[in-house]
């Protein structure tokens, strides 16, 4: 596989996937997210495609925009101990924070290495994937920063992207290299190594590559029982032969992967095929997937059963890069979508701590 580092993923997508926006699409409301003209219940942009999804839709709630003004919002993660959401504004090189108590939004951290993905570990410490520095870091409670991973077999990592934790203390992350393919999200240089998924051992700190079979591994999450790992492949941004899919593996002893197979296709009959960027599992094993680059009636969140059946959609007016469950009851979905942060209550909870 030969990458094309002269094209960043935004310009490439505009040329390759943008044409899909002209395809027929599901009806999407022309709504006012300012709050001056509230939407009528039930919210028509929470779409039930199959009766299996009906129980997750709350008919007297609506999608809300919590904040706007970012350049490219990514990496939402819920801090249960602090009752706040953190997310990345990659081009502006900062971490943002939304407080559950009063909805206040502020810059949590500047000069964040063009961070993309974030999560929290079992001790409530923020873990972040830095595009520009090629590092995975942990922010300690005392304010110090610990570098958890920056090299594989002596070579600097490309640009870590998304990250999750395992109950055994292991930290899993993807490295598709986007952060060194353009100045907008990092800097420009050739890929240093093959795009891959890695695991940091929670006890020894040793880094291991667990798979490099995807074109560009992006968002990732575990099944509720941690026996399977799902990873989005956004390889079509730079490899035209790559399919827009999510793959799944069996997790062996919490350390290695086997039995690779396709879990989800992002094709939507009669509408187009966009990218699955980030994803999370709910407690029933359904996948909630940030999707986009097709247009109205597609962009937003797609919900799939564990068998890969698309049962629902949350339509947004912007491309949804990533999402997480949070809130005091774990039943609130937070969605980072292009320039904005959105949220909606759902009748389920996230499977994991963030």
Give each language-model segment a name.
Residues 90-91, 132, 181-194, 238-244, ...:
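Short, solvent-exposed loop/turn segments at conserved positions within beta-propeller repeat blades
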Residues 249-255, 346-351:
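Short loop/turn segments immediately following beta-strands, especially the blade-tip
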Residues 94-96, 135-137, 196-198, 245-247, ...:
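A short loop-to-beta-strand structural motif that recurs across blades of beta-propeller domains
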Residues 31-61, 353:
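Blade/loop signatures of beta-propeller domains
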Residues 68-84, 111-130, 135, 153-171, ...:
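Beta-rich, blade/repeat-based domains predominating
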Residues 2-20:
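N-terminal secretory signal peptides and thylakoid transit peptides that target proteins
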Residues 56-68, 104-111, 142-154, 198-216, ...:
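Blade-edge beta-strand/turn elements of extracellular beta-propeller
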Residues 326-354:
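Blade-level signature of beta-propeller repeat domains, shared across WD40, Kelch, NHL, RCC1
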């Amino acid at each position: 596989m030969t990458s094309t580092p002269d094209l960043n993923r935004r310009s490439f997508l505009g040329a390759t996937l943008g044409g899909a926006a002209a395809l027929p699409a599901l009806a999407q409301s022309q709504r006012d997210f300012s709050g001056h003209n509230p939407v009528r219940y039930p919210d028509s942009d929470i779409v039930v495609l199959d009766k299996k999804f009906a129980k997750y839709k709350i008919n007297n709630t609506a999608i809300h925009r919590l904040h706007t003004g970012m350049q490219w919002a990514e990496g939402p993660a819920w801090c249960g101990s602090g009752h706040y959401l953190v997310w990345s504004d990659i081009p502006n090189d900062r971490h943002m924070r939304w407080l559950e108590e009063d909805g206040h939004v502020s810059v949590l951290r500047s000069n964040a290495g063009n961070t993309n993905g974030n999560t929290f570990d079992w001790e409530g410490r923020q873990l972040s994937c830095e595009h520009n520095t090629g590092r995975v870091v942990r922010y300690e409670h005392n304010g110090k920063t610990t570098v958890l991973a920056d090299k594989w077999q002596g070579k600097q990592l490309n640009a870590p992207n998304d990250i999750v934790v395992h109950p055994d203390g292991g930290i899993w992350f993807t490295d598709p290299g986007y952060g060194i393919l353009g100045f907008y999200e990092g800097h420009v240089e050739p890929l240093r190594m093959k795009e891959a998924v890695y695991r940091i051992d929670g006890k020894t700190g040793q880094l291991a590559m667990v798979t490099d079979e995807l074109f560009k591994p992006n968002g990732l999450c575990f099944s509720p029982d941690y026996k399977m790992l799902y990873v989005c492949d956004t390889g079509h941004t730079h490899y035209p032969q790559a399919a827009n899919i999510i793959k799944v593996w069996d997790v062996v002893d919490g350390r290695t992967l086997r039995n690779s197979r396709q879990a989800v296709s992002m094709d939507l009959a009669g509408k187009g095929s966009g990218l699955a960027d980030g994803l999370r599992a709910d407690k029933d094993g359904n996948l909630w997937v940030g999707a986009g680059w097709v247009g109205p009636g597609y962009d937003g969140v797609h919900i799939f059963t564990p068998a890969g059946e698309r049962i629902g959609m949350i339509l947004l007016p912007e491309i949804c890069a990533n999402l997480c469950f949070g809130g005091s009851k774990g039943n609130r979905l937070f969605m980072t979508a292009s320039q904005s942060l959105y949220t909606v209550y759902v009748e389920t909870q996230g499977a994991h701590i963030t």
